[in-house]
Amino acid sequence: MKRTYQPSVTRRKRTHGFRVRMKTRGGRAILNARRAKGRKRLAV
């Protein structure tokens, strides 16, 4: 059986990157929540 996680930098950035998070209202909510929590890294 093939492993499920096959890393790819491109796909990682396109699906979980900062700019993608900024696009939608929900994504911005995620970033704000992470800021409030004091996360060092907001997005990938």
Swiss-Prot record:
Alphabetized InterPro entries for the sequence: Ribosomal_bL34, Ribosomal_bL34_CS
Organism: Bordetella avium (strain 197N)
A Pfam family recorded for this sequence: Ribosomal_L34
Family (UniProt): Belongs to the bacterial ribosomal protein bL34 family.
PROSITE patterns attached to this UniProt entry: RIBOSOMAL_L34 (PS00784)
Keyword Ribonucleoprotein among record annotations: yes
One term under GO cellular component: ribosome
PANTHER family xrefs: LARGE RIBOSOMAL SUBUNIT PROTEIN BL34M (PTHR14503:SF4), MITOCHONDRIAL RIBOSOMAL PROTEIN 34 FAMILY MEMBER (PTHR14503)
Keywords attached to this entry: Ribonucleoprotein, Ribosomal protein
GO biological process annotation, one example: translation
This protein's name: Large ribosomal subunit protein bL34
HAMAP family: Ribosomal_bL34
Gene designation per UniProt: rpmH
GO molecular function terms attached to this record: structural constituent of ribosome
NCBIfam families listed in its UniProt record: rpmH_bact
